[in-house]
Amino acid sequence: MLVPPDMMAAQTRMVYQMNRFCTERVQARMYKTATAIREICKIVQDILKEVELQEPRFISSLVECNGRFEGVEVISPNEFEIVLYLNQMGVFNFVDDGTLPGCAVLKLSDGRKRSMSLWVEFITASGYLSSRKIRARFQTLVAQACDKSVYRDMVKMVGDTSEVKLRIRERFVVQITPAFKCSGIWPRSAAHWPVPHLPWPHPNIVAEVKTEGFDLLSKESVIMQNKNNNAASMEGDAWVLSFFEAENRLLQGGCRRRCLSMLKTLRDRHLDLPGNPISAYHLKNLLLYECEKHPRDFEWDEGCIADRINGIFLQLISCLQYRRCPHYFLPALDMFKGKSPSALEQAAKQVWRLTRELLTNANAFEKL
């Protein structure tokens, strides 16, 4: 098919501008983030070392590999989450019946005695391994470790939460989340995935993702807000499902990861709004939906990235207007749950302003 020269020139100019945006804005963000991660991980490693001395069941899994710290997720430029993997989940059954969207429970296997578990004192009368009880114990240990740390003058525990959050140098907030890795099984609530008859992702990658599995995190969930006491008590024992590694594996190939880096940079520069209605994780999920709409690798080459970003922002506007953003793997889970309607409304207007600029101004990336 013949393409008009002026159209080719416009696309070439757009690619040039996006490459420049990546060099000047995205790389700067990545460098700043990497510097922050190195700084906070050095401090957190010291604290976790002390925790392990006090309680050997909490073994630090925060290790540097090829210059990167594994298990660190960037929530925003100044907010991070570090996952601490726990051992010996084996005597528990994974129960995922959809009662709590985005959550599951760990129940003592039939015929297994409590004494067979490494986590015996955190098992409830009903035989559930309590996420909340483990977190409470871990929080106490981290608070004690902070008091003993050589970094104690620059680290404070964040109060008014059951989660383990540290404020470092008054600049960064780091959440340390105990977790179990669940390999070789796949949750029933994500059984619909992958969508049948779509060419993406390739069956080999699907098999890889399902073998790798998912994580169960000990953290608070907004799902149970305004629920009755019994449900809230059950929620305290429940674990939050996380597909962090699976998501990252799916975004390999083409310019998908580059697209995510650009979206995160645009979010930090233009969509960092009061109430945090739009997070980098929302954009990551919408990017995965966009991968289904555009399953071929050639649709993710550098000449198509602008179209993909526009498509993701149009999806985002629709989600903000309907006040619902379904999780990619767990569509019953609304990621806007707990966000104020006014914050979502203001966010929709801001995303539309940004999208309109991208759609109507051929030189938009020069200013963004």
Curated annotation (Swiss-Prot):
The organism's place on the tree of life at top rank: Eukaryota
PANTHER family linked: CELL FATE DETERMINING PROTEIN MAB21-RELATED, PROTEIN MAB-21-RELATED
Full protein name: Protein mab-21-like
Family indicated by similarity: Belongs to the mab-21 family.
GO cellular-component term (any): cytoplasm
Gene3D superfamilies associated with the record: 1.10.1410.40, 3.30.460.90
InterPro entries reported for this sequence: Mab-21-like_nuc_Trfase (IPR046903), Mab-21_HhH/H2TH-like (IPR046906), MAB21L/cGLR (IPR024810)
UniProt-listed GO biological process terms: eye development
Entry's transmembrane regions: none
